[in-house]
């Protein structure tokens, strides 16, 4: 939608109104009213735009308009209404009959605003502030607290070897530990936690140095000898098992031969019985 042409291009006048123009406008409005400000200049025969006619009537030519300065009561009313309505000048003018919104706005900015000691202009809203940001000091405190809690948690979950055997000057209790050696016996470690003393471990406890010194060549020889004996025994068992299997096969073969021989003897006895004996058999031959 394009912008309407200005008054000069339309052949309309601009500038101050003449008394003749004021008389024409007042007479037309009193007779016909002002239902349509855009069509009013043409109907009234004025070379003015509708906006100029409206402002001239509302601010100067209207019969009930008050002339002169604002009274003390009107100024107090403007201040109280401005605290409630703000810069809604037309709404304030509706509460003050005979005063226009333009006059009220002018008197506020020129006189009334300066009289207010506690007046503070509205600060522009800054929409560039990031939500959820914390002050720098609070962020530093929270980060230091988090690192401190993490370090305390690491110390409590992963104690070092020095902390196990370290002694505090405020405790004097006796603690004991039990270690299991390689041969199944248990040895106790007594630690006397006295102020200013270093905890000592009994010489009877098993350490890596004494354990290595107790192992000599005889230990390794006995171990190897026991392994050799185990291998010899296993070999003997394997040989004995093979011999037993061989004997079982031999016994099975001899039993089969006996069964075959017995079956052959039965066959010939049966033949002799059918032919009538050995003599008949020889005679037949």
Curated annotation (Swiss-Prot):
Domain of life: Eukaryota
HTH myb-type domain segment(s): 9-61, 62-116
PANTHER family attached to this UniProt entry: MYB FAMILY TRANSCRIPTION FACTOR, TRANSCRIPTION FACTOR MYB15
DNA-binding region coordinates: 37-61, 89-112
Localization (cell): Nucleus
Disulfide bonds: none
Bias kind Low complexity: ranges: 159-172
GO biological process, alphabetically ordered: response to cold; response to salt stress; response to water deprivation
Name assigned to this protein: Transcription factor MYB15
Role: Transcription factor involved in cold-regulation of CBF genes and in the development of freezing tolerance. May be part of a complex network of transcription factors controlling the expression of CBF genes and other genes in response to cold stress. Binds to the MYB recognition sequences in the promoters of CBF1, CBF2 and CBF3 genes. Involved in drought and salt tolerance. May enhance expression levels of genes involved in abscisic acid (ABA) biosynthesis and signaling, as well as those encoding stress-protective proteins.
Tissue expr: Expressed in roots, leaves, stems and flowers. Expressed in stomatal guard cells.
Biased composition (Polar residues): 139-158
Induction of the gene: Induced by abscisic acid (ABA) and drought stress. Induced by salt stress.
Note: Plants over-expressing MYB15 have improved drought and salt tolerance.
UniProt keyword terms in alphabetical order: DNA-binding, Nucleus, Repeat, Stress response, Transcription, Transcription regulation
A Pfam family per the record: Myb_DNA-binding
PROSITE patterns reported for this sequence: HTH_MYB
GO cellular component: nucleus
Organism of provenance: Arabidopsis thaliana
Known partners and oligomeric status: Interacts with SCRM/ICE1.
UniProt-listed InterPro entries: Homeodomain-like_sf, Myb_dom, Myb_TF_plants, SANT/Myb
Entry's Gene Ontology molecular function annotations: DNA binding; DNA-binding transcription factor activity
Gene3D superfamilies reported for this sequence: Homeodomain-like
Leader sequence residues: none
Spans annotated as Disordered: 115-172
């Amino acid at each position: 939608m394009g912008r309407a042409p200005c008054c000069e291009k339309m052949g309309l006048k601009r500038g101050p109104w003449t008394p003749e123009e004021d008389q024409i406008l007042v007479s037309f409005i009193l007779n016909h009213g002002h239902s349509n400000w855009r069509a009013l200049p043409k109907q009234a025969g004025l070379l003015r735009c509708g906006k100029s006619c409206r402002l001239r009537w509302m601010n100067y030519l209207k019969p009930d308009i008050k002339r002169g300065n604002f009274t003390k009561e009107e100024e107090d009313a403007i201040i109280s209404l401005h605290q409630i309505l703000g810069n809604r000048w037309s709404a304030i003018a509706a509460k003050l009959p005979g005063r226009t919104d333009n006059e009220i706005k002018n008197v506020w900015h020129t006189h009334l605003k300066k009289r207010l000691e506690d007046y503070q202009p509205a600060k522009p809203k800054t929409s560039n502030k990031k939500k959820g940001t914390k002050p720098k000091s609070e962020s530093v405190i929270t980060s230091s607290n988090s690192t401190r809690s993490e370090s305390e948690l690491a110390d409590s979950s992963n104690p070092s070897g020095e902390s196990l055997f370290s002694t505090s000057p405020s405790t004097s209790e006796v603690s004991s530990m039990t270690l299991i050696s390689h041969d199944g016996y248990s040895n106790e470690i007594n630690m006397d936690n006295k102020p200013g003393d270093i905890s000592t471990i009994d010489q009877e406890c098993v350490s890596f140095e004494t354990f290595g010194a107790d192992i000599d060549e005889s230990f390794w020889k006995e171990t190897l000898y026991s392994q050799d004996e185990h291998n010899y025994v296993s070999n003997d068992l394997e040989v004995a098992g093979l011999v037993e299997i061989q004997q079982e096969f031999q016994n099975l073969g001899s039993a089969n031969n006996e069964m075959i021989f017995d079956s052959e003897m039965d066959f010939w006895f049966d033949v002799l019985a059918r032919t009538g004996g050995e003599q008949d058999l020889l005679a037949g031959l």
